[in-house]
Amino acid sequence: MKRIIFMGRSECGKTSLTQAMRGEKVRYKKTQYINHFDVIIDTPGEYAENCNLARALALYAYESDVVGFLLSATEPYSLYAPNCTSAANREVIGIVTKIDREDANPERAENWLRLAGCKKVFHVSSKTGEGISDILEYLKEEGDVLPWEKEKEEKTTKNNKKTTKTS
Protein backbone atom coordinates (compact mmCIF):
# COMPACT_ATOMS: atom_id res chain seq x y z
CA MET A 1 0.00 0.00 0.00
CA LYS A 2 1.23 3.46 -0.82
CA ARG A 3 2.19 5.57 2.19
CA ILE A 4 0.58 9.04 2.31
CA ILE A 5 1.46 12.18 4.26
CA PHE A 6 -1.33 14.64 5.02
CA MET A 7 -0.50 18.35 4.83
CA GLY A 8 -2.76 21.33 5.38
CA ARG A 9 -3.55 24.16 7.74
CA SER A 10 -4.85 23.68 11.28
CA GLU A 11 -8.37 22.31 11.56
CA CYS A 12 -8.67 21.32 7.90
CA GLY A 13 -9.43 17.72 8.92
CA LYS A 14 -6.12 15.82 8.67
CA THR A 15 -6.46 13.94 11.96
CA SER A 16 -10.18 13.31 11.45
CA LEU A 17 -9.45 11.87 8.01
CA THR A 18 -6.71 9.68 9.50
CA GLN A 19 -9.17 8.37 12.10
CA ALA A 20 -11.89 7.78 9.48
CA MET A 21 -9.53 5.96 7.13
CA ARG A 22 -8.40 3.68 9.97
CA GLY A 23 -12.01 2.87 10.86
CA GLU A 24 -11.78 4.63 14.22
CA LYS A 25 -14.40 6.83 15.83
CA VAL A 26 -13.80 10.38 14.60
CA ARG A 27 -13.15 12.69 17.53
CA TYR A 28 -11.37 16.00 17.73
CA LYS A 29 -7.78 15.69 18.84
CA LYS A 30 -5.21 18.45 18.35
CA THR A 31 -2.12 17.07 16.63
CA GLN A 32 0.98 18.33 18.41
CA TYR A 33 3.68 16.52 16.42
CA ILE A 34 4.09 14.36 13.34
CA ASN A 35 2.36 10.99 13.86
CA HIS A 36 2.92 7.77 11.92
CA PHE A 37 -0.04 5.39 11.60
CA ASP A 38 0.94 2.42 9.45
CA VAL A 39 0.62 3.95 5.95
CA ILE A 40 -0.61 7.40 7.03
CA ILE A 41 1.55 10.27 8.27
CA ASP A 42 -0.51 12.92 10.07
CA THR A 43 1.07 16.35 10.53
CA PRO A 44 0.21 19.42 12.62
CA GLY A 45 -1.29 22.32 10.68
CA GLU A 46 1.25 24.73 12.14
CA TYR A 47 3.92 23.01 10.06
CA ALA A 48 2.14 24.08 6.86
CA GLU A 49 1.37 27.57 8.17
CA ASN A 50 4.89 28.47 9.31
CA CYS A 51 7.69 28.65 6.72
CA ASN A 52 10.32 27.62 9.29
CA LEU A 53 8.38 24.49 10.26
CA ALA A 54 7.44 23.74 6.64
CA ARG A 55 10.95 22.44 6.06
CA ALA A 56 10.10 19.50 8.31
CA LEU A 57 7.16 18.65 6.04
CA ALA A 58 9.49 18.59 3.05
CA LEU A 59 11.75 16.13 4.86
CA TYR A 60 8.89 13.91 6.02
CA ALA A 61 7.50 13.81 2.48
CA TYR A 62 10.47 11.59 1.62
CA GLU A 63 8.98 8.92 3.89
CA SER A 64 5.81 8.79 1.80
CA ASP A 65 4.83 7.68 -1.68
CA VAL A 66 2.04 10.24 -2.01
CA VAL A 67 1.56 13.74 -0.59
CA GLY A 68 -2.02 14.68 0.27
CA PHE A 69 -2.83 18.39 0.27
CA LEU A 70 -5.95 18.86 2.39
CA LEU A 71 -8.21 21.86 2.03
CA SER A 72 -11.49 22.29 3.86
CA ALA A 73 -14.53 23.02 1.70
CA THR A 74 -15.29 25.82 4.16
CA GLU A 75 -11.98 27.69 3.68
CA PRO A 76 -12.19 31.38 2.73
CA TYR A 77 -8.70 31.21 1.14
CA SER A 78 -6.11 28.70 -0.06
CA LEU A 79 -2.90 27.93 1.78
CA TYR A 80 -1.30 26.61 -1.41
CA ALA A 81 0.46 28.82 -3.94
CA PRO A 82 -0.27 28.26 -7.64
CA ASN A 83 1.76 25.38 -9.10
CA CYS A 84 3.48 24.65 -5.76
CA THR A 85 3.31 20.89 -6.41
CA SER A 86 5.99 21.26 -9.09
CA ALA A 87 8.56 21.46 -6.27
CA ALA A 88 7.60 17.98 -5.02
CA ASN A 89 9.33 14.82 -6.16
CA ARG A 90 6.31 12.78 -5.08
CA GLU A 91 2.82 12.50 -6.46
CA VAL A 92 0.61 15.18 -4.88
CA ILE A 93 -3.14 14.63 -4.63
CA GLY A 94 -5.76 17.07 -3.41
CA ILE A 95 -8.31 16.19 -0.75
CA VAL A 96 -11.30 18.47 -0.16
CA THR A 97 -12.60 17.85 3.38
CA LYS A 98 -15.76 18.77 5.27
CA ILE A 99 -17.98 18.44 2.21
CA ASP A 100 -20.93 17.60 4.49
CA ARG A 101 -20.97 21.07 6.08
CA GLU A 102 -23.80 23.43 5.21
CA ASP A 103 -21.38 26.25 4.39
CA ALA A 104 -19.20 24.01 2.21
CA ASN A 105 -18.03 25.10 -1.23
CA PRO A 106 -16.17 22.02 -2.52
CA GLU A 107 -15.93 23.31 -6.10
CA ARG A 108 -13.96 26.37 -4.97
CA ALA A 109 -11.63 24.24 -2.83
CA GLU A 110 -11.09 21.81 -5.72
CA ASN A 111 -10.26 24.70 -8.06
CA TRP A 112 -7.65 25.98 -5.59
CA LEU A 113 -6.09 22.51 -5.32
CA ARG A 114 -5.98 22.18 -9.11
CA LEU A 115 -4.31 25.61 -9.34
CA ALA A 116 -1.72 24.33 -6.86
CA GLY A 117 -1.03 21.50 -9.32
CA CYS A 118 -3.03 18.56 -7.95
CA LYS A 119 -4.08 16.40 -10.91
CA LYS A 120 -6.28 14.09 -8.81
CA VAL A 121 -8.70 15.54 -6.24
CA PHE A 122 -10.90 13.62 -3.79
CA HIS A 123 -13.95 14.96 -1.94
CA VAL A 124 -14.43 13.51 1.55
CA SER A 125 -16.40 13.81 4.75
CA SER A 126 -14.78 12.19 7.77
CA LYS A 127 -18.07 12.66 9.61
CA THR A 128 -20.28 10.75 7.14
CA GLY A 129 -17.56 8.56 5.60
CA GLU A 130 -18.28 9.80 2.08
CA GLY A 131 -15.26 9.49 -0.23
CA ILE A 132 -13.04 7.66 2.29
CA SER A 133 -13.14 4.36 0.37
CA ASP A 134 -12.08 6.19 -2.82
CA ILE A 135 -8.83 7.34 -1.18
CA LEU A 136 -8.17 3.88 0.28
CA GLU A 137 -8.72 2.27 -3.13
CA TYR A 138 -6.37 4.79 -4.71
CA LEU A 139 -3.64 3.99 -2.18
CA LYS A 140 -4.05 0.22 -2.43
CA GLU A 141 -1.71 -1.75 -4.60
CA GLU A 142 -2.41 -5.19 -6.01
CA GLY A 143 -2.94 -7.77 -3.26
CA ASP A 144 -2.89 -5.21 -0.44
CA VAL A 145 -4.76 -5.62 2.81
CA LEU A 146 -5.02 -2.55 5.01
CA PRO A 147 -2.70 -2.90 8.03
CA TRP A 148 -5.52 -2.20 10.52
CA GLU A 149 -7.80 -4.74 8.77
CA LYS A 150 -5.04 -7.32 9.08
CA GLU A 151 -4.77 -6.60 12.84
CA LYS A 152 -8.54 -7.09 13.26
CA GLU A 153 -8.38 -10.41 11.36
CA GLU A 154 -5.52 -11.62 13.55
CA LYS A 155 -7.42 -10.71 16.74
CA THR A 156 -10.55 -12.48 15.49
CA THR A 157 -8.55 -15.59 14.58
CA LYS A 158 -6.83 -15.54 17.98
CA ASN A 159 -10.18 -15.20 19.80
CA ASN A 160 -11.67 -18.05 17.74
CA LYS A 161 -8.74 -20.31 18.70
CA LYS A 162 -9.25 -19.48 22.41
CA THR A 163 -12.95 -20.28 22.12
CA THR A 164 -12.20 -23.60 20.40
CA LYS A 165 -9.68 -24.62 23.11
CA THR A 166 -12.11 -23.95 25.96
CA SER A 167 -14.95 -25.90 24.32
Kindly give the residue locations of the regions a language model identified.
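Canonical P-loop GTPase G-domain recognition
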Residues: E102-T163, S167
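Switch II of P-loop NTPase G domains
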Residues: R22, I41-S86, D103
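Conserved C-terminal guanine-recognition region of P-loop GTPase G domains, centered on the G4
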Residues: F69-H123, Y138
